[in-house]
Amino acid sequence: MRGGAAGKRRTTVGFGGAPPPPPPSIEQQRHLFNSRDSDASFASSRPSSIGLGGRGASDDRSSMIRFINAFLSTHNFPISIRGNPVPSVKDISETLKFLLSALDYPCDSIKWDEDLVFFLKSQKCPFKITKSSLKAPNTPHNWPTVLAVVHWLAELARFHQHLVSNSTSVPEDNSMNFFAIQSFGHFIRGEDDKVNDLDSQFLGKLEAEKTSVAETISGCEKISGELEAKLESLRKGPSKKESLEKVKADLENDVNKFRTIVVEYTDRNPAMEKVVEEKAKELKAKEEERERISVENKELKKSVELQNFSAADVNRMRRELQAVERDVADAEVARDGWDQKAWELNSQIRNQFHQIQTLAIDCNQALRRLKLDIQFAVNERGETPAAVMGVDYKSVVKPALCSLCDGIKGSSAEKVEELVTLQHHKSEMASKIESKRSLLGSIQLQINDLEEKMKLVKKETQELSTKCDLEAKTLVESVKAEALNLEVVEKEAAEFVKASELRLQEAVKESEEEVQACAAQLFALIDSISKQKEYMDSKISEIKTGVADTASAVSEIYKANFKKNLGI
């Protein structure tokens, strides 16, 4: 039977965390399971819903099956649902029983189908299912609805388990309000012992929070000490110049390594050039072979074209192929039309049969109220009206109704006689009522007196409530004073943290100033070294010129002496 939406699905709270992809809506599922294929399409190679979104329906069903199998696998359930072929009746029934157990719903092993139908109705499931459809759930008519019900139960079970796993107590975010409400409630009830216990508990919590604040302050002091130690280590450690010199030495080593690698690759270049030349020669040989093969292919094409095929034969073959294609297309269109008509007729018959079933149920209920031993039993395979309804109206139902009508007429006459007697009783009751009204007047006076007394009691209770309100206000003020003390402690802690941060900033500034002073000294030293270098260069140039002059003078003196010696 087709699943129809009997009511709207109840909105549920979303899962915590990253929830899973959202399931298809009720309208999508209703469209999916109302647009199923007809009976004739199961025997054919193509479904009757071609062009009506059949592929989307199959995708939705496959996504439902994947969701159900994922849920069953997470619970180590040995059975998995398949789309093609359809699972057996036993697998479907075991899956439904398991889902009911996952929802903590007691299920009878024998009458589990009745329990399932009652559970779906109580939870307002959007898909209708009956016991008769559960007897054969894997038939083409029942399988889409059963699959939708299984998917709906799996979603409900997952949501139920999420609620069970994430069941949290009532939040107590504002502890002060919670304490005030509880203490006032105990005070109103006169439970002084519980009030004292609650006060002691709350004071214990406040002391625990105070100790936690003290611990955070000590932790901040430890952090400030660690930061000061780091500052001292930075002062005592190597300067930036030394670290930069180390980096420079490492970079020079890397440059030398890269130079050696470049030299090695330049040595390998001639060998690689030889390999490239060999590959170029092989490529030329391959191109020559390709040209030869292309020439052979052209010759083969020419020989094929020279074969005898007349144009008339080719045109005739084309026309025959076109005619065959048109016949095939017409046959497919006709088959689709007949499938559509069969599907529509089946849907109309099914709707009429459902209406007959509902009418038969209403008639059976009316016959039970009339206390007649006649019941309509609808039969799908009946050929005559009597066979379909299970009872012949003219021979069985009509005589019974006529006899019932005669009995009603006889009983109506008796009721008229009873009505006359009841009117006499009515007059007697009226006299009794008047006597009782006088009694009610006296009772009303007593009630008024009691109401005045109640007003006095209410005034007293209001005065007591005002007193209780004043006492509650005093308690609230005391709690607020303690809260202010806590805020003062927190402010002192925050000021201490700020002071430590300011000290740290001052220390950092001092270290930066010292570094800048060292850098200025370094730059001054570099300037003096450059000036000294220039001075030494000028001195060396002067010495070189003097040495050159002395060398020229010595050579001239030597030449003069040598000439003198030669003249002698």
Swiss-Prot record:
One of its GO terms (cellular component) is Ndc80 complex. The keyword Translocase does not apply. The keyword Cell cycle applies. Residues 241-334, 433-469 form a coiled coil. It is found in: Chromosome, Centromere. GO terms for biological process: cell division. It holds the Pfam family Ndc80_HEC. Residues 40-49 have a biased composition (Low complexity). GO terms for molecular function: microtubule binding. Residues 28-39 have a biased composition (Basic and acidic residues). Keywords: Cell cycle, Cell division, Centromere, Chromosome, Coiled coil, Mitosis. Residues 1-59 are annotated as: Disordered. Belongs to the NDC80/HEC1 family. PANTHER family: KINETOCHORE PROTEIN NDC80 HOMOLOG (PTHR46681:SF1). Acts as a component of the essential kinetochore-associated NDC80 complex, which is required for chromosome segregation and spindle checkpoint activity to ensure proper cell division. Component of the NDC80 complex, which consists of NDC80, NUF2, SPC24 and SPC25. This is Kinetochore protein NDC80 homolog. It comes from Arabidopsis thaliana (Mouse-ear cress).
